[in-house]
Amino acid sequence: MATSSSAFDDELPMEEGMPELLDDEDVPSTLPSLLEQNLDTAPKGDEFKLVKRKRKSGNAIDVVMEDVSQVDEDATADTADDSTGPKSSKRTKGVKGESRVVPVPKHRYTPLKDNWVNIFTPIVKNLGLQVRFNLKKRQVEIRNPVDREDTTDLQKATDFVRAFILGFEVNDAIALIRLDHLFLETFEVADVKHSLKGDHVSRAIGRIAGKDGRTKLVIENTTKTRIVVANTKIHILGAYQNLKLARNAVCSLILGSNPSKVYGSLRNMASRGAERL
């Protein structure tokens, strides 16, 4: 996955950036008829069945009349028996009282405990959800109220907790609750360049962070994103277009680009943004 400085010459990141719409050529001109798709070819109850009976002489066809109503009653009875059996524990989307679970690794147990007040306050007060930390299973459990079916706030709270577990600060992760156009992207160093092994992986991670974290800070401030480097995984939080620019910068550093070259591209992009403003 090769990138160059031209990747930073795209349009400036916009807070409300969205993917481009499809061209008319990509959209099919006609759709199949619903009548054809839902055409019922099953035999009706008042129809006859033609049954071939093997005979030694000739291939005569006998008409046999079956009691279809009896077959329907048997099928209904089987369905009723299945419905009385054990129900699946998997809940469908929109069920009242639906819950989500976010597992907590060992190294994030203490930070979660220290920031627990700052985490459950926006979830309970702003979103009106129920949240608890299961000490036995070491996971955060978030649940919708019994009288609510909408899962939008439930998903926002789940993304907020997950972002904190990945290593983002509470003040940065809470933007997932307040803003609707933010996304969270995760990839590994090996996804960019498979041939990196041993010390080369450490050097690539060092180029991303920079001395005293300056390189990462420059990318964050220029692209208006937040980046977390956790071992060989890179997590980026930001708007759609901003994620693209930050990802290109990080990938360029992983592939061996000189940090000064990346700095120059970011400075040019920042200067163009200042001129437009």
UniProtKB/Swiss-Prot annotation:
GO cellular component terms, A-Z: nucleolus; nucleus; small-subunit processome
Annotated function: Part of the small subunit (SSU) processome, first precursor of the small eukaryotic ribosomal subunit. During the assembly of the SSU processome in the nucleolus, many ribosome biogenesis factors, an RNA chaperone and ribosomal proteins associate with the nascent pre-rRNA and work in concert to generate RNA folding, modifications, rearrangements and cleavage as well as targeted degradation of pre-ribosomal RNA by the RNA exosome. Positively regulates dimethylation of two adjacent adenosines in the loop of a conserved hairpin near the 3'-end of 18S rRNA.
Disordered, as annotated region: 1-52, 72-100
Keyword field: Nucleus, RNA-binding
Quaternary structure note: Part of the small subunit (SSU) processome, composed of more than 70 proteins and the RNA chaperone small nucleolar RNA (snoRNA) U3.
Record-linked CDD domains: KH-I_PNO1_rpt1, KH-I_PNO1_rpt2
Matches recorded under SMART domains: KH
GO BP of this protein: ribosomal small subunit biogenesis
Start-end of Polar residues biased regions: 30-40
Domain KH positions: 198-250
Provenance organism: Caenorhabditis elegans
Membrane-spanning residues: none
Compositional bias segments (type: Acidic residues): 8-27, 72-81
Protein name: RNA-binding protein pno-1
Main location: nucleus
Localization: Nucleus, Nucleolus
